[in-house]
UniProtKB/Swiss-Prot annotation:
The gene is rpsG. InterPro entries: Ribosomal_uS7, Ribosomal_uS7_bac/org-type, Ribosomal_uS7_CS, Ribosomal_uS7_dom, Ribosomal_uS7_dom_sf. This is Small ribosomal subunit protein uS7. One of the primary rRNA binding proteins, it binds directly to 16S rRNA where it nucleates assembly of the head domain of the 30S subunit. Is located at the subunit interface close to the decoding center, probably blocks exit of the E-site tRNA. Keywords: Ribonucleoprotein, Ribosomal protein, RNA-binding, rRNA-binding, tRNA-binding. GO terms for cellular component: small ribosomal subunit. Part of the 30S ribosomal subunit. Contacts proteins S9 and S11. It holds the Pfam family Ribosomal_S7. It comes from Pseudomonas fluorescens (strain Pf0-1). GO terms for biological process: translation.
Length: 157
């Protein structure tokens, strides 16, 4: 065990437009090479596209609904017991749930075919809010993997 003190968690400031802390965190996930202004433009552009396509809905509410649809409840972790490696299902703590959801959302948005990243992100957000899309499929795959390895749940960490 390291003897050094654990670094204190830095407070994340709310994003300037919507005043949401979770959206500010999401912008940090979208950001590449420290270019925060570009990340902000992408995220706000995606939310404007979502608002234009789904009139009458608050884009921030839809964003949070999409994150909930993507966030996994359980995942598997490898545990080595007597020469065999077992995939042990474990519950995901809330902070990791959000982090995984954001990471998957950005990763699968980058793999989409639309022209700009803002349009890709908007498309993935709309799909996730409706319960479809690649990010939601990833969550279902993770849940299926945990369900298949339920027999090893007594090897908890």
């Amino acid at each position: 065990m390291p003897r050094r003190r654990v670094a204190a968690k830095r407070e994340i400031l709310d994003d300037p437009k919507y005043g949401s802390q979770i959206l500010a965190k999401f912008m940090n996930h979208v950001m590449e090479s420290g270019k925060k202004a570009v990340a902000e433009r992408i995220v706000y552009g995606a939310l404007e596209t979502v608002a234009a396509r789904k009139t009458g809905t608050d884009p921030l509410e839809l964003f949070e609904k999409a994150l909930d649809a993507i966030a996994p409840l359980v995942e598997v972790k490898s545990r080595r017991v007597g020469g065999a490696t077992y995939q042990v299902p474990v519950e995901v703590r809330p902070s990791r749930r959000n982090a995984l959801a954001m990471r998957w959302l950005v990763d699968f948005a980058r793999k989409r075919g639309e022209k700009s990243m803002a349009l890709r992100l908007a498309g993935e957000l709309l799909d996730a809010a409706e319960g479809k899309g690649a990010a939601v499929k990833k969550r279902e795959d993770v849940h299926r993997m945990a369900e298949a390895n339920k027999a090893f749940s007594h090897y908890r960490f």
